[in-house]
Curated annotation (Swiss-Prot):
Belongs to the MscL family. The keyword Protease does not apply. Keywords: Cell membrane, Ion channel, Ion transport, Membrane, Transmembrane, Transmembrane helix, Transport. One of its GO terms (molecular function) is mechanosensitive monoatomic ion channel activity. InterPro entries: Mechanosensitive_channel_CS, MS_channel, MSC/AndL, MscL_channel. It is a multi-pass membrane protein. Channel that opens in response to stretch forces in the membrane lipid bilayer. May participate in the regulation of osmotic pressure changes within the cell. It comes from Bacillus pumilus (strain SAFR-032). It is found in: Cell membrane. Homopentamer. NCBIfam families: mscL, PRK00567.1-4, PRK13955.1. This is Large-conductance mechanosensitive channel. One of its GO terms (cellular component) is plasma membrane.
């Protein structure tokens, strides 16, 4: 059972997935910092000096932090757009690879003539053997 697990864990897809999850987690932290520390303060200045993280509505004893929600939505949009651009780039590379594989080499005129001469000589040789 340990051997089977080792074979499973060493497969390229599992390792790629693990690396992707780790990098994705780190990327998420970078985007969160970008939104919280750079984008939202600039947006706050543009719309009148508001700090979005502190925006809230108090209803009874409940406090609804909609500013934090706005920041989370912006995080999501930036991460989604970044992933979209990355996947689009990967798909473009895959299409280019497929197109390169589909290109069929057409023999040049010299090759065609040499092939015809070879076939004619082979045919003549077989005709002489039959006689």
């Amino acid at each position: 059972m340990l051997k089977e697990f080792r074979e499973f864990a060493v497969k390229g897809n599992v390792i790629d997935l693990a690396v992707g999850v780790i990098i994705g987690g780190a990327f998420g932290k970078i985007v969160t910092s970008l939104v919280n520390d750079l984008i939202m303060p600039l947006v706050g200045i543009i719309i009148g000096g508001h700090d979005f993280s502190g925006l809230s509505i108090k209803i009874g004893s409940a406090q609804i932090l909609y500013g934090s929600f706005i920041q989370t939505v912006i995080d999501f949009l930036i991460i989604s757009f970044s992933i979209f651009i990355f996947i689009r780039y990967l798909n473009k590379l895959k299409r280019k690879k497929v197109e390169e594989e589909e290109v069929v080499e057409t023999p040049d005129q010299t090759e065609v003539l040499l092939t015809e001469i070879r076939d004619l000589l082979k045919h003549q040789s077989q005709s002489k053997d039959v006689q």
